[in-house]
Amino acid sequence: MSILVLADHDNGQLAGATLNTVAAATQIGGDIHVLVAGDSSGDVAKAAAAVAGVSKVLVAADASMNHGIAENVAPVIQGLASGYSHLLAPATTTGKNIMPRVAALLDVMQISDIISVVDANTFQRPIYAGNAIATVKSDEAVKIITVRSTAFEAVAAEGGSAAIEDVASGNDSGLSSYVKSELSSSERPELTSAPIVISGGRGMQDGSNFAMLEKVADKLGAAVGASRAAVDAGFVPNDYQVGQTGKVVAPDLYVAVGISGAIQHLAGMKDSKVIVAINKDDEAPIFQVADFGLVADLFEAVPEFEKAL
């Protein structure tokens, strides 16, 4: 049994979510190969070869593979599929774009966003915004799977010594083309990988009040997030959003400030190791999942918290 993992990367660095996906592959069992797509991905291939548990790295080195254009990458995976029992990718923007196309090309079902491996054919995934867990069994000859990275402990980034091989890259389909990327930059940790996250909700009342959270974040070395209500209200940009339609996080500490706790938000953060909630409404749903709760006016509690740090 062999497993192919699609590497998530930016042509310079291997994304951490790939290490979590390899961890899921390890639980399935079998030889683990990693596919790196991109014409300037030599450093990424070397990093993938060093990942613990990986026995081979395949490199599709062609300009058409750059930027993870699904219409170009999916046929390459299709061409490799016959040699594998499982095809895995992180449930990131890239993985969610490419893997359904691979499933369609192979005419097999996809199992999305798994959080647990029961056995080589059976997996668990959240449904109903995380309020229920579905156990899904697949009898397909090739299983197409996306992995929720926060559900699996990352394997070691070093210790492996996999062989690196080139594979046929295919041609540019001409169906889509890369235009540009607009990347936000911050001195704070990336939201999905930060060990501490402090998020604000509609209770913040105004975008300028997020400065209170930023002061706390600066002292804790934390990332700043937000609920969809805060994003929709224009308090902060969309890339702050945590939840079912935003980013899924599972930090060591998650602090929810002025967030009521709609199920869509809980779906994106309920796997956090420790959850702290600050809200003046003692019946807010967020307190049902919080390990520690403070019923207080956030405009008094947060400044006091910041001064105490």
Region roles according to the model:
Residues 1-309:
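N-terminal glycine-rich FAD/FM-binding segment characteristic of electron-transfer flavoproteins
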